[in-house]
From Swiss-Prot:
NCBIfam families: tfb2
Subcellular location: Nucleus
Pfam family, one: Tfb2
Protein name: General transcription and DNA repair factor IIH subunit TFB2
Alphabetic keyword roster: DNA damage, DNA repair, Nucleus, Transcription, Transcription regulation
Membrane spanning residue stretches: none
Cellular compartments per GO CC: transcription factor TFIIH core complex
Main subcellular localisation: nucleus
Native source organism of the sequence: Arabidopsis thaliana (Mouse-ear cress)
Length: 452
């Protein structure tokens, strides 16, 4: 089954995939250089800092002496990463061998950053000029609510309802793979869309941001400029207000889209307008593997396939409905059951057993999460068995042949099909056989020659 593929796990993977010209342009921004330095593997970071004030190429043999004998593989990974990001330039010389030098722009900006001690991309507004700002708890609640509303829009649109309050930029992201629309029917969730809903929040967020960046040129926005601005956001202080007048028109439009996702909160006073970054925005440059601590789960799974979800979230209820039968819903409790029919419906929509099991494990209630396994083994085994039930039959396009003039012609046709690895089935008594469609033309020519 097709899967939602996150090609780049974080911003740095996407930065590395940029053309050389755009990558060099990014390094004109001090904050990009700092963000990339933070993201590097420990050994790669060590190499950059050691070479920061060396203006001549460093021989590869000398760098190999900087690591222990058992660190060869880590050394190679670090060098490859630095070359991939164009931080290192590899210089080959027949006499002197291979050497490496730092990207001069990257080097100069890091030197300036170390000397100046680091300056914020833009200063927060004075508290006198802004109205009462939300607390960090209120801001986190707002971000969660916005993100859940965003995902509910995706689910509702998949059920035939129109998208409301979603910008055209975000609508295009939905249409790039999460939603499909036929001529007469309304939009429907694709297999990737169903799988997307079972991802954890960090994976979902990065998928949306990645598509937003890839879609940038269609909005006449330079992807390098967009990446630069998004990475700058990660250096802002969560909960502080920043004046919108300091931003370009493109950056203002970007913030409106990010507000849909809950990455920023937009506010307006009598004179000024400002944005307030949430924790989602300041964590943008963090990789999926290093993302925030595991959130508290809410699902209790029993051995009898009944499931209890302690949640008041409409979104969580709709996600559970993707693979379970909702039996009743109380203000803070959703009672449901995993059945063969509910799972078959999930499998038909492209969701896999592993995705369902991973979702249940990641969202296990704290009292269940500590036990091993957190989900009863009979439940996980049965989910996988029901999936294999649908995989027992493999569909292959084929052609059926009968009414052979003689036994010899039939046997010759069988041998010919075997040679071409196209024989699927044969009945010697009735002289019938089935071959793959790929060899149909060859089989037809062969039978034509046999009839002469």
């Amino acid at each position: 089954m097709p899967q939602v593929k996150i090609i780049a796990k974080n911003f740095m993977d996407m930065v590395a995939s940029l053309p050389a010209i755009k990558l060099d342009k990014l390094y004109n921004n001090v904050f990009i250089c700092e963000a990339i330095l933070r993201s590097l593997p420990p050994l790669a970071k060590k190499y950059v800092l050691q070479m920061l004030y060396i203006d001549v190429p460093v021989p590869a043999t000398m760098m190999e002496e900087w690591v222990l004998a058992d660190g060869t593989s880590k050394h190679r990974v670090a060098i490859d990463r630095l070359i991939q990001l164009r931080i290192f330039s590899e210089i080959s010389d027949r006499k002197r061998g291979t050497s490496y030098s730092l990207n001069p722009t990257f080097q100069n900006n890091l030197q300036k950053h170390i000397i100046s001690g680091g300056v914020l991309p833009r200063e927060p507004m004075n508290s006198d000029n802004a109205i009462k700002l939300p607390s960090l708890q209120e801001l986190e609640t707002y971000a969660l609510k916005q993100w859940e509303c965003f995902l509910l829009q995706l689910i509702n649109s998949g059920q035939g309802e129109k998208l409301t309050g979603i910008s055209s930029s975000m609508m295009k992201i939905f249409q790039r793979g999460l939603l499909s629309q036929r001529d007469k029917d309304g939009p429907r969730l694709t297999e990737s869309g169903f799988q997307f809903l079972l991802m954890d929040t960090n994976a979902q967020l990065w998928y949306i941001i990645r598509e937003y960046i890839l879609n940038a040129e269609e909005r006449d926005v330079d992807p390098a400029d967009l990446i630069s601005f998004l990475l700058e956001l990660s250096f802002h202080v969560t909960g502080q207000a920043y004046n919108l007048n300091t931003l370009t028109e493109v950056q203002n439009n970007t913030l409106k889209d990010l507000a849909d996702l809950g990455l920023v909160k937009l506010q307006q006073g009598r004179k000024d307008s400002w944005f307030i970054p949430t924790k989602l925005a300041t964590n943008l440059s963090v990789s999926l593997a290093d993302s925030s601590a595991r959130k508290e789960g809410f699902v209790v799974m029993e051995t009898n396939f009944r499931m209890y979800a302690y949640s008041t979230s409409k979104l969580q209820c709709e996600i559970l409905r993707l693979f379970a039968r909702i039996e009743y819903q109380l203000p803070n409790l959703i009672a449901c059951a995993i059945t063969k029919e509910s799972l078959y419906n999930a499998f038909d929509n492209g969701i896999t057993s592993d995705q369902i099991i991973t979702f249940l494990q990641q969202n296990s209630h704290p009292r269940c999460a500590d036990r091993v396994p957190s989900i009863p083994e009979n439940v996980t085994d049965q989910i996988r068995l029901w999936e294999t039930d649908l995989q027992r039959i493999e569909m292959t396009q084929a052609h059926f042949y009968d009414e052979f003039p003689s036994k010899d012609v039939f046997e010759a046709a069988c041998d010919f099909a075997r040679e071409w690895r196209g024989l699927l089935w044969e009945d010697s008594k009735r002289m019938r056989l089935v071959v793959k469609s790929e060899v149909h033309n060859q089989m037809r020519e062969f039978l034509h020659t046999q009839s002469r």
